[in-house]
Design a protein with these regions (language model features):
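Glycine-rich phosphate/adenylate-binding loop
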Residues: 141-282, 405-409, 413-555
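N-terminal charged helix/coil linker that caps or initiates catalytic domains
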Residues: 266-322
């Protein structure tokens, strides 16, 4: 049925394809899509190819589908069956290789040539037999669910294994995890989620899929029998809480890496069926098809590598314990950045509760109002990763100084220049009575940020904290007194500051901390300069700051 709602570019494509002997097979339920079909002869067999032209063509490239199901899993670049089109998509264009075409006809010409080239390679048997594994997940995965697994737990299993799995129920979906139970509990407690413990079957297929990739129950059963695991599967056919999923691993040909994916069995439980295994083993279901399911490695070594580089992985491997004294706008945001770069063992200390006055510049939002900052921050950070160790103390640091003794680094993040408690912590570091300290604070309106490392290299005999802080400040005292505000009440003074300025400095603080954790030799004093604006008149007489300048210097 011809589609009467086509755009001018779709009509152009229709005329172009008709000249190539395609015919219009658009359906009423395909709405704004143009579907064109043509029969090609491949290896003496007639194969239907369907072309899909979107209403966004040429911004969306033409898509090609084959209705020949025997081509799937036999040749590369052919994806799972698309029920909307009733065919398997031919993936001929990588997103990173796509160009913008000013002339839609040029795109049609190039796309059709790529299609012919692909079909010719099939005709001439030019595809490497192992090429299908290079993009395994692209065509294997069919379901929307994902198995999130920790590879470090799985890789020790060499054959067949029934392992613990967990379904975490979020507000709008259920997530499947294979991870240490203590981390599941910790994550769910932080996120206020519930979880259900189940079992899942894991099979190591080794190199067997190189010879034949199964599609049906009978093909998979034959493969499992060949590997000697069929009896193991039969033993658990009456076991409860077995998910209808098989996680499996294979060796990618020509690659030393082990790849993981999963299979989903669409078996509805009945009173007579305990799990999916009985229907799977039944001869009456031999031609039934299971669904490919993606499996994602969530081990921290993988996540940190994807989220940055090997530095993140190495920071995580150090597993150094970091205390953050002060979980206000500076400490909370810095803790978040450090967790994201691999610091997974934090001690958070702050006696205060989160006030609405701080919401605009604090990492935590309205959800955490009137909660202790350290405990609320622990909950927030606990939702970022599974394998993370965070403890929170809702007391004044002077009352819990002993808690700092087993830390590898102490960060004081009080947001402004030091007080007498911070001086005590710093002097302990200088005198080797505690771990080194990095003090992080801002000058007026957060236009300037300071990160200072205090350790045993500092001379305790000449150390004078107030003198030091006054010397390294870039603004004179007038700037501080000019911008300090006061609310009603005792100890109600505060310094307003620009969020964007603060975030700039926090990135430098995190960079400084990371380099220190990696045992790099760093300068003791880092200064970052944000938007100075009208405050340039308060710069000390011997200083001049250009826009976007980062200053690093020792003291």
């Amino acid at each position: 049925m011809p589609n009467n709602n086509l755009t001018s570019n779709q009509l152009l494509a229709k005329d172009y394809l008709e000249e190539l002997d395609f015919i219009d097979i658009s359906k009423s339920d395909t709405k704004d899509l143009l579907l064109m079909s043509k029969q090609f002869t491949i290896n003496k067999s007639s194969v239907e190819i369907i072309t899909e032209i979107s209403h966004n063509f040429p911004l969306k490239y033409p898509k090609f589908y084959t209705t020949d199901t025997t081509m799937f899993l036999k040749y590369p670049h052919i994806e799972q069956h698309n029920h909307r089109i009733s065919g398997h998509r031919l993936c001929l264009d990588a997103d990173e290789d796509k160009l913008y075409y000013e002339n839609p006809s040029d795109l049609l010409y190039d796309s059709y040539n790529r299609l012919e080239g692909f079909l010719n390679k099939i005709e001439n048997n030019e595809f490497d037999k192992n090429e299908i594994f290079d993009e395994f997940d692209s065509y294997w995965c069919k379901t929307t669910g994902i198995v999130h697994f920790n590879k470090e737990l799985i890789q020790k299993f060499k054959s067949f294994k029934v392992i613990d799995s967990y379904i975490i129920k979020t507000e709008d979906k259920e997530l499947l995890f294979i991870e240490d139970e203590k981390y599941i509990e910790q994550f769910c407690k932080s996120a206020n989620y519930n979880f259900i413990k189940n079992k899942i079957v894991y099979i190591n297929f080794e190199r067997e899929l190189e010879k034949n990739i199964p599609r049906t129950y009978s093909e998979l059963k034959s493969l499992i029998q060949k590997l000697g695991y069929l009896s193991s599967l039969q033993k658990i056919k009456k076991a409860k809480n077995i998910l209808p999923v098989i996680l499996f691993s294979i060796f990618i040909p020509g690659n030393k890496e082990t790849h993981y994916a999963a299979m989903y069995f669409d078996e509805i439980k009945s009173t007579n069926v305990v799990n999916f295994i009985n229907p799977f083993l039944s001869d009456s279901n031999s031609n039934k098809v299971f669904y490919g399911m993606p499996a994602m490695n969530i081990s921290n070594s993988r996540l940190y590598k994807r989220g940055g580089n090997l530095m993140n992985v190495n920071v995580h491997k150090k597993r150094k314990k970091i205390a953050i004294v002060g979980c206000g706008s500076v400490g909370a945001a810095l803790a978040h950045k450090l967790v994201k770069v691999g610091c997974n063992n934090l001690l958070l200390i702050d006696p205060e509760t989160l006030s609405s006055d701080n919401i605009a510049r604090h990492l935590l939002g309205m959800e955490y109002l009137e909660q202790n900052k350290a405990i609320a921050l622990k909950r927030y950070l606990g939702k970022q990763f599974l394998d993370i160790e965070i403890s929170a103390v809702d007391e004044y640091v002077e009352d819990v100084l002993n808690d700092l003794k087993d830390c590898d680094l102490i960060i004081t993040a009080l947001g402004s220049d030091a007080n007498h408690i911070e001086e005590k912590i710093i002097r302990d570091a200088i005198n080797k009575n505690s771990a080194p300290v990095i003090s992080c604070w801002f000058e007026a309106t957060a236009c300037i940020g300071h990160g200072i490392l205090f350790d045993s290299t500092c001379d305790s005999k000449v150390f004078n904290m107030n003198k030091l802080f006054n010397e390294i400040m870039l603004l004179d005292e007038k700037a501080t007194s000019m911008f300090v505000k006061s609310d009603v009440g005792c100890n109600s003074n505060y310094m307003p500051y620009t969020y964007l300025n603060a975030n700039l400095h926090l990135n430098h603080f995190a960079n400084m901390v990371t380099k220190y954790l990696m045992d790099e030799k760093i300068k003791n004093h880092w200064v970052s300069v944000g938007e100075i604006g009208s405050l340039d008149k308060y710069l000390k007489s011997d200083l001049k700051v250009e826009d976007n300048t980062l200053i690093k210097r020792d003291f």
